[in-house]
Amino acid sequence: MTQTPDREKALELAVAQIEKSYGKGSVMRLGDEARQPISVIPTGSIALDVALGIGGLPRGRVIEIYGPESSGKTTVALHAVANAQAAGGVAAFIDAEHALDPDYAKKLGVDTDSLLVSQPDTGEQALEIADMLIRSGALDIVVIDSVAALVPRAELEGEMGDSHVGLQARLMSQALRKMTGALNNSGTTAIFINQLRDKIGVMFGSPETTTGGKALKFYASVRMDVRRVETLKDGTNAVGNRTRVKVVKNKCLAEGTRIFDPVTGTTHRIEDVVDGRKPIHVVAAAKDGTLHARPVVSWFDQGTRDVIGLRIAGGAIVWATPDHKVLTEYGWRAAGELRKGDRVAQPRRFDGFGDSAPIPADHARLLGYLIGDGRDGWVGGKTPINFINVQRALIDDVTRIAATLGCAAHPQGRISLAIAHRPGERNGVADLCQQAGIYGKLAWEKTIPNWFFEPDIAADIVGNLLFGLFESDGWVSREQTGALRVGYTTTSEQLAHQIHWLLLRFGVGSTVRDYDPTQKRPSIVNGRRIQSKRQVFEVRISGMDNVTAFAESVPMWGPRGAALIQAIPEATQGRRRGSQATYLAAEMTDAVLNYLDERGVTAQEAAAMIGVASGDPRGGMKQVLGASRLRRDRVQALADALDDKFLHDMLAEELRYSVIREVLPTRRARTFDLEVEELHTLVAEGVVVHNCSPPFKQAEFDILYGKGISREGSLIDMGVDQGLIRKSGAWFTYEGEQLGQGKENARNFLVENADVADEIEKKIKEKLGIGAVVTDDPSNDGVLPAPVDF
């Protein structure tokens, strides 16, 4: 809506008043000026510059470098100082450890004559000096070495053994609050070198932690974990170290986020996992869209932060920091960028089956009955196990199975069955319940034993368990559209999520939501009213593709199964809306259509191969395979007819894409990080997200004794990785010119031929798109630099 002249004038007056009070540029329209690339300070290693993503350390930001002793932390910081000075900048070094070696710094390229050095007496003095230098606006980079040496004045003036709990953490928090604004305004980069300490009593995971509290983790735009990997040798002489730097950033999930462990079948809340440092497994997504179980290897409590909520179709809500990456049908996007109507990735299928049978199928079915409608005896076995159900077919089935386990079933009225062992025989039903962990448990405490989540369990074992559950507390209903729904209702939250994940093994999609027992379902085909004073959870299967898959996967001879089978033919007549699992990701549409065009497959040919399920070929190939998105069943039929590997690879993706119904307002919450081994993703609240610590980018380079980071060695490593330098045996070759035999000789060649080294560096940066040059008029080519996420 266009603003009226009076409102525009009022806004101009307000902006003028703000600029008068706080300076020009305090308020601006984002479209008034072109966005400039982030200015950076090179680190001296092209590999590390690439890992940072923008060609170096960002100016105007806080950087934390931490790691074990003698790992190369100070060397990395001094190289940044040398590069800042080489560009004409001014550098300062706050030597709180009183351990700076001027000769070593000079060998790394630092201009020690112009370097500002301070060796403060207390932590307050060090941070105050740094703050004053930053606020001068004349400084390009300042290094504080180290956080552990920033000892508060009160501790220095006290006696040995005095306790000063949290004093240094409060000092760091206050200093960073003051400094961050000044750093941004002056464009100064502040590097804090930090040390590692070990937490006492840690049983699982790494006990390592950094000093100075948690404030630095939050204020740091970039955190770098420096580790020495191996010793470099020239013959038998050690000449340096191979160093690995992991670039760490903080993106987090909020407390309350539920994470499923596919190994134990247990759903955990993320705060319980982190606080207890539980060595759980999670479901993680690979780049090809397949799902795998992977262990959690690190746990991080990231404090209280702003989080936003994404309400997904089906009821799931994910709360995450706005910069946390979520997998969408167009790739990874920050949670804060997502809007209502966008689609996010959820599991479509997971794990599959083998041929293992930990218990017979009849026993699995009995467990399903007893989890749903059983009231198990108390420990001691004197109280019989009761099965309460009105269906005669189920009562007869329980009676028959109990007889094979040394038990007799005695009717207790019309709907109850008491199961007790026969004289002289062992109570096999009680043994089965105890083995499964449900003996003596109340309804809301019951769960499915972890054997059912073994990767090689047979499908009929799981199918019979689900049969027993479905026939006890399940239901079938009809929507207003005529489509069917199937579900299961329970007071056990763990049980509801376990059923959801077992259904995914059959490729049956479902949702878990809170259920209000006072609500009336649209039209019950077969089921019963739920009455409970406790919280109730519902597993709901929607979409005729999922309902049909459920009917094909689980035995259907019971009363509810028979009702479902009878209702399916009518429900599948005409056009019925399927679930989101029916469709491929929108990102795949062009790839599939272009491939078929290149292969020479016409719309008419594709329609003939697909058959009656095909779309109208007069609308082209896209209409044949779907409409706005391609239908999985049609692409599957075409892939089978063509026996085409490319199409089968596309269909191997185990994800579906569900729409975001609502973006919830920001709130404050505790947030947590996990590090997931290898794949660096996980399924949280049923949505695929980056593991809270996103895939760490790593860089490896050589630090030579007395020389520092080997720029030339890093260029050789990156050149080989990017295909610019060819390695054949021990020889390194660049554009037909031999650099030398062995890395040391190739390194010496680049030292002596700086123009070749510069050319290789330029080509690496151009290929990877880093190291943008700031121009006077960035709009000359009509393209603005991409924003950089820190």
Curated annotation (Swiss-Prot):
Keywords: ATP-binding, Autocatalytic cleavage, Cytoplasm, DNA damage, DNA recombination, DNA repair, DNA-binding, Endonuclease, Hydrolase, Intron homing, Isopeptide bond, Nuclease, Nucleotide-binding, Protein splicing, SOS response, Ubl conjugation. NCBIfam families: intein_Cterm, intein_Nterm, PRK09519.1, tigrfam_recA. The gene is recA. ATP binds at residues 67-74. HAMAP family: RecA (MF_00268). There is a cross-link at residue 762 (Isoglutamyl lysine isopeptide (Lys-Gln) (interchain with Q-Cter in protein Pup)). Can catalyze the hydrolysis of ATP in the presence of single-stranded DNA, the ATP-dependent uptake of single-stranded DNA by duplex DNA, and the ATP-dependent hybridization of homologous single-stranded DNAs. It interacts with LexA causing its activation and leading to its autocatalytic cleavage. PI-MtuI is an endonuclease. PROSITE patterns: INTEIN_C_TER, INTEIN_ENDONUCLEASE, INTEIN_N_TER, RECA_1, RECA_2, RECA_3. It is found in: Cytoplasm. This protein undergoes a protein self splicing that involves a post-translational excision of the intervening region (intein) followed by peptide ligation. Gene3D superfamilies: Hedgehog/Intein (Hint) domain, Homing endonucleases, P-loop containing nucleotide triphosphate hydrolases, RecA protein, C-terminal domain. This is Protein RecA. SUPFAM superfamilies: Hedgehog/intein (Hint) domain, Homing endonucleases, P-loop containing nucleoside triphosphate hydrolases, RecA protein, C-terminal domain. It comes from the Bacteria. It comes from Mycobacterium tuberculosis (strain ATCC 25618 / H37Rv). Belongs to the RecA family. InterPro entries: AAA+_ATPase, DNA_recomb/repair_RecA, DNA_recomb/repair_RecA_CS, Hint_dom_C, Hint_dom_N, Hint_dom_sf, Homing_endonucl, INTEIN. Interacts with UvrD1 and UvrA. Co-immunoprecipitates with DarG in the presence and absence of darT. GO terms for molecular function: ATP binding; ATP hydrolysis activity; ATP-dependent activity, acting on DNA; ATP-dependent DNA damage sensor activity; damaged DNA binding; DNA endonuclease activity; DNA strand exchange activity; magnesium ion binding. Residues 366-508 form the DOD-type homing endonuclease domain. GO terms for cellular component: cytosol.
